[in-house]
Amino acid sequence: MSSQLEFTKEVEKNTAGIYQKIKSVVPEIEWPLHAPYIYKINELKKKKNAVILAHNYQTPEIYYGVADIIGDSLTLAIEAEKTKADIIIMAGVHFMAETAKIMSPNKKVLIPDINAGCSLAESITADDVRKLKKQYPGVPVVTYVNTSAEVKAETDVCCTSANGVKVVESLGVKEVIFLPDIYLAKYVALQTKVKIISWHGKCMVHDQFTAEELNQLRKNYPDLVIVSHPECPPDVIRSSDFTGSTSGMIQYVKNKKPKNVFLVTECSMSDNVQVENPTTNFIRPCNLCPHMKKIQLPKIYDCLINETNEILIDNSVIQKARLPIERMIKVGRQSSLS
C-alpha cells in the first residue's frame, strides 16, 4: 500500500467543503489523514475517466468524499449499467463488484480489497442451487443479489431487500425457492401468499440484533423510532416501527424526521444519514460489517492508481447471470409505471 500522503494547504483548501459537510461525524483529528487521499482520488478519477460506486454502508469520508454514485444494491446495479466511465471502482463488497461487471462487461471493474466478502454470499454455492432445483423441479429460483456471479447464473430472477415481494409475485406461481437469506425469506413470506422455500443464510451484521436490545432502548428513549432492515431476525422486525431496504430506511428518516431514531443496520449508515438529517438524534448501538470496513481510502487510491484487483468473470457466467438481474430491474420499472 502507498505511504501516507501529505496534508498540504492545497489539499486543505480543495477539501474544505467536504469536511464542512461531514465534520459532525468525522473527528477533526482524522481529517488530515483522509483529505489527501480524497483530493488525489478525485483528481485521478478525472484523468482516468473512472467512477466510484459506493454502498450506503461505506464510511462518510468515502461516501461523501469520493463516491460519484451512492445507494443500495439495486441502485448500484442499475447505475453500473448506465455509466459512461471507462473504469468502475466498487466501494462495496465482492458480490457488488461482480454485479457491476455483469452489468458492464466491457468496463474495467476494480475493487479496493479483493477479500471484502459477504457472509450471505458465502452461505451458498452454485452447486447448492443446482441441488435445490433437482429437489424442487420446475420451481422458480429467486436469488437475493447478495450472492456470487456463479449463483446468479443458476437463478431465474434476482431481487433486493427493496423489491423481494414484487419480484416473487411477478412470477405468477404458487411457490418459489428464495435464496439465500432466511430472514429476508421470512419477511417476504409474511407479505405474499406464494409459498417460500428458503435457505439458511444470514447476514452476520443483522443477525446480531435482538428484540431484547430494542425493548431496552425504548425504555431508555420513550419516543425512539426504530427502523430495521429485512435481513434482521423476525422478532427484531416485529419490534420495529418501519422495515425497509437501506434506501427505504434513508427515505423514511428523511420524510418522518424523528427526534430519536435507531437504524438497525450497519454503523456507518447512521453517520451518513445524520449528515443529511442534522436535527435527528441517531442512537448507535449498531454493528460493524468487517467486510465493508476493508474498503478504505488508501486502498481506493492504490486500486485506482495501479488499476489492481480487477474483477474477471467468465463470459458464459456473465451472460447467464445478467438475465436474472435484468428481469429484476424490469420488474422494478413495471411497478413504477403501475
Where are these regions (language model features)?
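Active-site loop-to-helix "anion-binding N-cap" substructures in soluble metabolic enzymes
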Residues: S2-V264, M269-S338
